[in-house]
Amino acid sequence: MKFFPLLLLIGVVGYIMNVLFTTWLPTNYMFDPKTLNEICNSVISKHNAAEGLSTEDLLQDVRDALASHYGDEYINRYVKEEWVFNNAGGAMGQMIILHASVSEYLILFGTAVGTEGHTGVHFADDYFTILHGTQIAALPYATEAEVYTPGMTHHLKKGYAKQYSMPGGSFALELAQGWIPCMLPFGFLDTFSSTLDLYTLYRTVYLTARDMGKNLLQNKKF
């Protein structure tokens, strides 16, 4: 019984956060999944019509198109040194943060060698638009996989979980909208349970906190 007050507090806080998730929190969103999909498809089409362009060129052009639409103050510069590994849910990939705030994050995520794992269960909606390669995903009861190819957006709803895989050379633009701080432990716990890659953890925390602080204090973006 001594834990009852704590459990009650957690329940009340969770209830309030869930109410705010559908009422107040969306008023802070600046990104629209449909618009992001249109921007991505526009860049993908241009690259499909061109020759000699690399995957990195594609990623940089997506970033530039986003900055042109939303403004450089909200979209970080593409700096190769700011790519970091991401170990979460048994999967390992690479990511660079384009925008991070309390209510949203926008990243380029992918893998040069291929990966497979658990999506995690999040207090946020996740929109995963494939830029190059493929993502395969499935719910627990599925007997056939969902297949997402360039230009398609995979929407993982709040509270749901899937198994997913991406072959080598697959990259995507990922938008999460919700209580972003609640997602962070999922991205950090593998450091202590398996990888012990403290440098990557430090870089991830630093880059995330830097951008959240900038958007909260400078851009007044929650």
Swiss-Prot record:
InterPro entries in UniProt: ERG2_sigma1_rcpt-like
GO cellular component labels: endoplasmic reticulum; endoplasmic reticulum membrane
Observed effect of gene inactivation: Abolishes the production of ergosterol.
The keyword Ribonucleoprotein is assigned to this record: no
Induction: Expression is increased during ergosterol starvation, during anaerobic growth or in the presence of SR31747A, a sterol isomerase inhibitor. Exogenously-supplied zymosterol is entirely transformed into ergosterol, which represses ERG2 expression. However, exogenously-supplied ergosterol does not affect ERG2 expression.
Molecular function (Gene Ontology), one example: C-8 sterol isomerase activity
UniProt catalytic activity: fecosterol = episterol
GO biological process, one term: ergosterol biosynthetic process
Top-level enzyme category: isomerase
TM region positions: 3-23
Keywords: Endoplasmic reticulum, Isomerase, Lipid biosynthesis, Lipid metabolism, Membrane, Steroid biosynthesis, Steroid metabolism, Sterol biosynthesis, Sterol metabolism, Transmembrane, Transmembrane helix
EC number, as in UniProt: 5.-.-.-
Annotated control of activity: Catalytic activity is inhibited by the morphilines tridemorph, fenpropimorph, and fenpropidin.
Pathway the protein contributes to: Steroid metabolism; ergosterol biosynthesis; ergosterol from zymosterol: step 2/5
Function text: The third module or late pathway involves the ergosterol synthesis itself through consecutive reactions that mainly occur in the endoplasmic reticulum (ER) membrane. Firstly, the squalene synthase ERG9 catalyzes the condensation of 2 farnesyl pyrophosphate moieties to form squalene, which is the precursor of all steroids.
Recorded family membership: Belongs to the ERG2 family.
Further remark: Present with 2640 molecules/cell in log phase SD medium.
Matching PANTHER family: SIGMA 1-TYPE OPIOID RECEPTOR-RELATED (PTHR10868), SIGMA NON-OPIOID INTRACELLULAR RECEPTOR 1 (PTHR10868:SF1)
Protein name: C-8 sterol isomerase ERG2
UniProt organism field: Saccharomyces cerevisiae (strain ATCC 204508 / S288c)
Gene: ERG2
